[in-house]
Every structure is written in C-alpha cells, then in structure tokens.
Amino acid sequence: MGSYLEEQYNRDFNDGKISLENFDTKKAYETGTSPFKQAIAEEFKQYNTNSEFIDEINSFKNMLLKTQIILTTNYDTFIEDNYNSTSQYKITKYVGQKGFFCNTYGYAELFKIHGSVDLPNTIVITEEDYNNFDKNSILISSKIISTLINSPIVFIGYSLTDKNIRKIINNFTSQLDSTERKYLEDRIILIEYKKGESTLIEETINDNDLGCELKVIKTENFKYVFDTIAKINQGIAPTEIRKYQHIIKKLIIDKGK
C-alpha cells in the first residue's frame, strides 16, 4: 500500500496537482527526496499534547532519563524533544542504520530505526523500504544483545503481533543456545496496551515461533509503568555516564600518544 501511495502521490506532485510548502519539483530533484516522504515528514513534524495526559507525559519524561538506549519506529521527534527538555545533557540521535556500525557509548542514545522527520528519505514506508529494513535488521538485534548484557530490554506500547517486534526478537533468539535463551527470557519485557485495564496484568507467554518465553504486561495505566521505571536508582544517570566515558576515552587516547 505504501509503495502504491508513494507512486500516486509523486505523480500528482510532479503534475502540479499537489503542492508542498517550500518544496517544489526542483528541490525534490536536487535533494533526491521523495515528495511523498516529504509530505509525511511535514505532517509528523507538528504534534500537540492532550492536556488530559500531562501527568502521564511528565512521568514519561522522568522515565526517559533512566534509559541507556532507546529504539523507536516512530518518525516524530516526541522522544528527543521530551528528553532534551528534561535533561541538561542532550540525547544522541541516530537515524536509520546509522550508529549500528559505530562504536557508540551505549548511554543516552536514541536509534530511530524507521527514519525521522528530520531526514524524510530515511522514512520506512514502502515495500522496498521494509525489505531493506529486514535485510539489515540483524544489526538491530546485535545492538539489543549487547545491551542485554548489562540491562533489561523493555518494549513499550508494542504488541507481540507487531511484525517488527517479532522480527527483532526472532533474529537474536535464533542465535542463542538454551542457556542464553533462558537468560534472555529473564531480561526482556513487553508492555502491551490493553484498553480499560488500570492494573497491571502480567503473563508469561511461550511463543513457539519465536522460540522463547516472554514476560508480557498488559495495561492502560502507562503512567504507573513510567513512574515505576523512573524510581530505579542507578546511582548515576546514563547521560552522566556517557559524559564521563567520553572524558575517560579522551584521556586514554591522549595518554597513548
């Protein structure tokens, strides 16, 4: 469907039937940007927060400060905007496959694996985009596995029926032996939205296709989830760790000269 929509939209754009502010056929040609993806980027650049969820958003901000690595399939800048408005240290952002080949610090980092509104052509929306994403999804799995060594992984707002989540989980479970898989099962949690459920329903699901058991928490009360994670005492914030890691790395490099 995405491929069809892009084809139709770009055709109408080139024929002058559709226009975009500050973006014309010349700019599309010079930058190699798909008008369809440009339109999506412009749409998701703007967002409004519902006053009804202010308390939940504040809890979300506090939770973000406890995270080491964040992976998201969202195009918008909601996560980085809220993180940076709360922390004196900015989160480091990687878009698409960028960062998976880099020697990153592993703290206060955001990986936007389906692209970002800042870079319209990185947006994953067409069949070709998803095929390319699937080919490189093992990189995401490698990043998750390296993170699991030190910290648990929490999927928030996704479902086990989500194709992307299943692909990511399957990629790394298929590479593990039974002992390693058991270690994984104790450290991965999926928090799934369940309308009308104010409490937390915890289940352990044995998924034969994924080849592992998963802890699944179902709830509508995400504020409670955010508050609980925010209470974790790490001793020092991930942003602080990244700051000092950079200093230590620089000292080691300078010492080696």
Where are the regions a protein language model picked out?
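Active-site glycine-rich loop that binds ribose-phosphate moieties when present
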Residues: 54, 128-143, 171
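Glycine-rich adenosine-cofactor-binding loop
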Residues: 154-159
